Amino acid sequence: MSAGRPEQKAEDLREAMFVIGRAARAASRELALASNSTKNAALCAMAAHLRQQSGAILQANAADLEAAKAGGLAASFIDRLTLTDDRIEAMARGLEEIAELPDPVGVTLAEWTRPNGLRFERVRVPIGVIGIIYESRPNVTADAGGLCIKAGNAAILRTGSDAFRS
């Protein structure tokens, strides 16, 4: 098959998804065991990285916006796609706020003892890998990724194609 045929592209996508899935599964094992301080440090590092890379992010977003406008997308869609210094700062603050939340992992939600003495507990545990597909809203990437990390889960995030560069 030639590289341009749809069958080849589908096979390439399938292989890419397997690679991403395997990497996410491996990461999920580490995240599930990560301490709250480790997860919080990662969230704060993500916030710092957003701030440090804001110029490059805004430049990439400008390319996404140009393509969206050329494609005749609605003004409301373009507004949701648009990043500014203030919006990037809000994304970074959101990650820091997630870091300040209590660790949800290991919290006992319920416990009971059966008449035969057998004791049960319902405890919050990480799910493992969470896949999220969402509209072209760059801020969702930070919010969803941050919440997944806080809960000890790996995430596979897929934004709309209009925000790939952002």
Residue ranges and their predicted role:
Residues E100, P104-S166:
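Conserved small-residue-rich beta-alpha loop and adjacent elements
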